[in-house]
Amino acid sequence: MSRLDSMIRRLLAQRACLEAVAEMIEDLPGPVLEIGLGNGRTYDHLRERLPERTILVFDRVLAAHPDCIPPLDTFFLGELETTLPLAYKRIGATAVLAHADIGSGRGDHDSANAALLARLLPPMLRARALVVSDQQLHCAELKPEALPEGIPTGRYFLYRCIK
């Protein structure tokens, strides 16, 4: 499969997962975490799809399209091992949804980031919160959920927090 085809399939899976979880969290309060702003496409989609939610955004560098830059009071710039604990101090265990797009295509790097996220993310999540991730997360508090129909296993990952 070409890299273009792979990217298209990944983006289709991402959108399908985000659409599914948006409906699943309708009756649950709490902010949304967008981990990995990148150029801001997913953040833009989330703020359009979930306009009533506060969206906290995390990235190492700010490289988003100017129309997709979050407000400064919701943007955490820096490494996840620093920024996620800062956000936890602010919101506690209230996040209802976390979307993580942290893959780089470099296996060892991605595995290390996924392990870090699996350790730091669950304390920030409320019971029954959902996590959508481009990386597999191994954590006792995150139970794998079924992906939307048509999304192949391993293309994207969906979890529910079972506190």
State where each predicted segment sits:
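C-terminal substrate-binding/active-site "lid" region of AdoMet-derived donor-dependent transferases
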Residues: S104-K163
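Class I SAM-dependent methyltransferase Rossmann-like catalytic core
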Residues: M1-G30
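Conserved class I S-adenosyl-L-methionine
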Residues: L28-G38
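S-adenosyl-L-methionine
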Residues: V61-G92
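Short SAM/SAH-binding signature in class I
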Residues: A93-G103
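Conserved SAM-binding motif I beta-strand of class I
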Residues: R53-D59
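A generic alpha-to-beta junction signature in SAM-dependent methyltransferases
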Residues: E26, L50, I91-G92, M124-L125
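Glycine-rich SAM-binding Motif I of class I
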Residues: G40-D44
